[in-house]
């Protein structure tokens, strides 16, 4: 019976081929065009910043890795196809209706497309995936030694940090490549007749057998290599149910030998597989593969399970003791918690204190922080916003400066940035948004330890921050009334101004000044940017490229762009640092500071690893998620680390966007490796100017990770560690509106690191006992240049109330609750509790301080900004409460205790502070109402009605009662007296 010829593929006409080529060209252009534009823009941007070498190094590495991986993987797959084709049978009998014959005809008709196209496509995909691992490859090429060896194999930790990840990557690619080559070879032999299936039987040509068996043998050999590398990865492995990270008793005594046994079995199986080439018997490799599978189940899984259940669990604490000690040592090393960094001291926490002892603790009592940076932002907006398009973030920052008397003080600080999203009406058109409203103006600082005036009621004047302002004044000169002199308060770069989808500004001289700057009583003053930052935009090529990038035709047609124009974009400080140092993880908190008369944003950068042997693997998002991060939706990306260093301090100039990287950790091997990859990008630590060092602070995210780990790894004894009985807990935020951990707080207080009474800027946190609300420890991280980075842990052995119990005691105190009930007026006014600070005072005592704010009405409107109305304290179960720190300290410790506390700043003629030099008033919202005052007593021959006389007597009686209650510290009576006074004044005004 004759064979039917296979159907031929229809040929395309010339017109069809042209249309297909055009369509493919359009697709390629759509896919590659935006990437080419982005690459060119990045080349310009990195060059403008002075970091073009970073861009070219990354680009070259990615291209080389993509090409090498693509050629290797594609070449291996091509080899599998080519061998199958070259060794195909000369004659393949075709049966009727054989589907393989049709496929064979299709492949033969498009042999070059199939033979080259499939490997090329696979190679391209492999290259695209591989180029994303450019950092791992660069670390392998430039990584060095740690100078520390692992306790099991004696290898330097640089092997685990830099080499092992690279070997794993290469092994994974080889396994995938050989497997794909096996599949390609198998399919090709089937199509070309090297493998024929007929019913329940089949035929296999010699070339097909040799090639397929060889590829399987290579796969088994690669599996043997994988077993060898698995041994090292055990040291960063976490077995379920263990309170520590790393290889435990079962891993070392069962899993580790099992890996060696499996490796030996894999080598034997590989030999058995290769033997099929000569013996022509596929049963031998089949038996070998089954043996390998059974061995992995029995030796690799079954035996360790038996050891765990029979040997380890009955005596787990003793069996795991050695390995717990390894984990304690490694975790402390990996997270910077070694004995040269962390100092432990016993601290009673409940020692009695006299008024004289408290007053002598001047560094603490004079700096008790009253302003909560998460609460006072509406007050900044009310008094310092000036225009609708200026904006302050919801959470402000804390920094320290020397006051006019040379004393160290902490300040709530904020940059008055431009928020493009708050532009209204015609301000939103393209020219105004991108060429007129281009920058913010001003640096605002408020002493954190005081407010202006006393507000006994949220409707009274007082209780608002004292504002120190650096701003462009009405005559165009800089008004420097802030905590430090500032030459240039204009802000072109910042986290607020960049918080839009198109955050670019077009600046530069092109005719008259165009940018909005400030207003006088007569007109609006304009400005032209003169900084060095910005990508030139004068040429038509640049205009075309940016028109395509931002999909905006005005780049091409607008006459506001001239030969001197520049474009400022990518204006977020943290993102600029991450771009020029892509190997860094940045802290979630970026803060402004005045350094050498320049306003800069300070960014903390971390180097991290996720495979440090025996070190605990920590989720950054979980460890850093305190109540502030949750409330302001500022959670860091989920990233797991087992090693972290605050290796880099970066500054971003708020005016011209200059990024400067400084080496902070001179011993970090990871940073040293990256400094070899990108030489010259990170300046040595010695280049940090003293003026900058005075504003560097211990980073929040690192501290939160460390306190989470100190909760476990302060324990030295492995048996105690295993029992978890001596662990600590990070306390929950006691504020009833919070739902996560209590955040750490920056404060100025007495020097815990030096154990003296000098003022020190530090980051502090209380720690609870494990699953209890009593204090276990107090952690302080020094930010002073001389002791920067030192952690001091005060361990508290007694039963001292933790933050939750302290907050409960304060809020349920009868005097406090009655007074705030009167102020709240049945929820007509909103009461808010500020941050609960824990402060060591006197000789072994702990003072809790919690400011109380109130705002008129129940809304969060800026016009209803919160005022400080009370200060609550607790010491040794006793509550102190009053309008000022001095009153609260006196109530706790007696007369004289508040002698060194900072007093309340006077109000300026009972008028709230005016907004910064001559900007227009806030767009909306009334000014705070004046304090309610008693009507003057009539004098002379004025006859009052009996009703007015009676009301006046009630007024005088209420004033006298209020004074007596204030002297006695009876704030429940004081609140009642204020209410009587309001009622009496109303009666007086209504009386005829």
Curated annotation (Swiss-Prot):
Mode of membrane association: Multi-pass membrane protein
Q: Which UniProt keywords apply?
A: Cell membrane, Membrane, Transmembrane, Transmembrane helix
Q: Does the keyword Cell inner membrane apply?
A: no
Signal peptide extent: none
Q: Where is the composition biased (Pro residues)?
A: 912-938
Sequence intervals crossing the membrane:
17-39, 59-81, 113-135, 169-191, 212-229, 255-277, 284-306
Residue span of region Disordered: 906-938
Presence of the UniProt keyword Transport in the record: no
Q: Which family does it belong to?
A: Belongs to the UPF0182 family.
Q: Report the PANTHER family cross-referenced here.
A: UPF0182 PROTEIN SLL1060
Q: What is this protein called?
A: UPF0182 protein Mb3215c
Which species does the entry assign this protein to?
A: Mycobacterium bovis (strain ATCC BAA-935 / AF2122/97)
């Amino acid at each position: 019976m004759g064979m039917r010829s296979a159907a031929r593929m229809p040929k395309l006409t010339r017109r069809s081929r042209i249309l297909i080529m055009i369509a493919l060209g359009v697709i390629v252009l759509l896919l590659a065009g935006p990437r080419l534009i982005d690459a060119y823009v990045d080349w310009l941007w990195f060059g403008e910043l002075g970091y073009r070498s970073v861009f070219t190094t990354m680009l070259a590495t990615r291209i080389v890795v993509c090409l090498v991986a693509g050629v290797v993987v594609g070449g291996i797959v091509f080899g599998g196809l080519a061998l199958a084709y070259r060794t195909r049978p000369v004659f393949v009998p075709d049966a009727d209706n054989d589907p393989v014959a049709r496929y064979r005809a299709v492949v033969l008709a498009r042999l070059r497309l199939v033979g080259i196209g499939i490997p090329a496509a696979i190679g391209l995909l492999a290259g695209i995936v591989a180029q994303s691992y450019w950092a791992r490859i660069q670390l392998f090429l430039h990584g060095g030694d740690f100078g520390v060896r692992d306790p099991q194999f004696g290898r330097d930790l640089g092997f685990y940090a830099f080499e092992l990840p690279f070997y794993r990557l290469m092994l994974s690619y080889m396994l995938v490549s050989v497997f794909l080559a096996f599949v390609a070879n198998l399919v090709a032999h089937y199509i070309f007749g090297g493998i024929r299936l007929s019913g329940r039987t089949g035929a296999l040509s010699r070339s097909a057998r040799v090639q397929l068996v060889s590829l399987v043998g290579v796969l088994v050999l690669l599996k043997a290599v994988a077993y060898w590398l698995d041994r090292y990865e055990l040291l960063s492995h976490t077995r379920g149910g263990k309170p520590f990270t790393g290889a435990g008793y079962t891993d070392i005594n069962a899993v580790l030998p099992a890996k060696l046994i499996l490796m030996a079995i894999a080598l034997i199986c590989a030999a058995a597989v290769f033997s099929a080439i000569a013996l022509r018997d596929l049963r031998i490799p089949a038996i070998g593969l089954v043996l390998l599978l059974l061995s992995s189940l029995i030796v690799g899984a079954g035996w360790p399970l038996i050891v765990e259940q029979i040997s380890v669990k009955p005596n787990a604490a003793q069996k795991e003791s050695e390995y717990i000690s390894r984990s304690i040592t490694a975790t402390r090393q990996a997270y910077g918690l070694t004995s040269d960094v962390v100092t432990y001291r016993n601290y009673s926490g409940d020692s009695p204190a006299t008024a004289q002892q408290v007053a002598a603790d001047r560094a603490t009592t004079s700096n008790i922080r009253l302003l909560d940076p998460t609460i006072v932002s509406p007050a900044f907006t009310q008094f310092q916003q000036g225009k609708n398009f200026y904006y302050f973030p919801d959470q402000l920052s804390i920094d320290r400066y020397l006051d006019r008397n040379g004393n160290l003080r902490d300040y709530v600080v904020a940059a008055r940035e431009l928020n493009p999203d708050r532009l209204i009406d015609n301000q939103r058109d393209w020219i105004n948004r991108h060429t007129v409203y281009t920058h913010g103006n001003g640096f605002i600082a408020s002493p954190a330890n005081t407010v202006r005036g006393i507000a006994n009621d949220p409707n009274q004047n007082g209780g608002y921050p004292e504002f120190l302002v650096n701003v462009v004044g009405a005559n165009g000169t800089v008004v420097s009334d802030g905590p430090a002199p500032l030459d240039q308060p204009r802000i072109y770069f910042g986290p607020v101004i960049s918080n839009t989808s198109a955050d670019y500004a077009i600046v530069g001289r092109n005719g008259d000044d165009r940018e909005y700057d400030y207003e006088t009583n007569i007109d609006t003053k304009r400005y032209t940017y003169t900084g060095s930052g910005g990508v030139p935009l004068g040429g038509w090529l640049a205009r075309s490229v940016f028109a395509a990038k931002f999909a905006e035709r005005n780049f091409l047609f607008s006459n506001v762009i001239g030969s001197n124009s520049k474009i400022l974009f990518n204006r977020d400080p943290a993102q600029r640092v991450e771009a020029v140092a892509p190997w860094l993880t940045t802290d979630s908190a970026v803060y402004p500071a005045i350094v050498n008369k320049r306003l800069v944003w300070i960014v903390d950068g971390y180097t991290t690893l996720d495979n440090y042997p025996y070190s605990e693997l920590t989720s950054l998002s979980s460890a850093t998620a305190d109540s502030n991060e949750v409330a302001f939706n500022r959670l860091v990306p989920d990233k797991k680390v087992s090693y972290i260093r605050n290796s880099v301090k970066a500054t971003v100039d708020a005016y011209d966007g200059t990024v400067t990287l400084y080496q902070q950790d001179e011993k970090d091997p990871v940073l040293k490796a990256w400094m070899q990859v990108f030489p010259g990008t990170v300046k040595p630590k010695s280049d940090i100017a003293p003026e900058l060092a005075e504003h560097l602070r211990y980073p929040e995210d690192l501290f939160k990770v460390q306190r989470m780990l100190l909760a476990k790894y302060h324990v030295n004894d492995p048996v105690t560690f295993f029992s978890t009985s001596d662990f600590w807990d990070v306390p929950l935020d006691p504020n009833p509106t919070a739902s996560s951990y209590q955040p750490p707080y920056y404060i100025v207080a007495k020097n815990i690191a030096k154990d003296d009474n000098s003022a020190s800027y530090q980051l502090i946190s209380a720690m609870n006992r494990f699953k209890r609300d009593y204090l276990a420890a107090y952690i302080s991280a020094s930010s002073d240049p001389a002791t920067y980075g030192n952690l001091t842990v005060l361990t508290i052995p007694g039963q001292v109330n933790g933050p939750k119990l302290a907050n409960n005691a304060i809020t349920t105190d009868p005097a406090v609750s009655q007074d705030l009930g009167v102020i709240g007026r049945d929820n007509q006014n909103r009461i808010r509790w500020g941050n609960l600070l824990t402060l060591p005072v006197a000789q072994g005592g702990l003072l809790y301080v919690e400011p109380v704010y109130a705002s008129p009405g129940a809304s969060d409107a800026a016009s209803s900004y919160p005022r400080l109305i009370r200060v609550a304290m607790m010491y040794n179960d006793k509550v102190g409460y009053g309008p000022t720190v001095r009153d609260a300290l006196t109530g706790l410790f007696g007369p004289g205790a508040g002698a060194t506390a900072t007093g309340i700043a006077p109000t300026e003629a009972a008028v709230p502070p005016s907004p910064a030099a001559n900007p227009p008033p806030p767009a909306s919202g009334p000014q705070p109402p004046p304090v309610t005052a008693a009507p003057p007593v009539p004098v002379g021959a004025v006859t009052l009605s009996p009703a007015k006389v009676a009301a006046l007597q009630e007024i005088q009686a209420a004033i006298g009662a209020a004074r007596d209650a204030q002297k006695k510290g009876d704030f429940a009576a004081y609140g009642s007296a204020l209410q009587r006074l309001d009622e009496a004044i109303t009666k007086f005004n209504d009386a005829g």
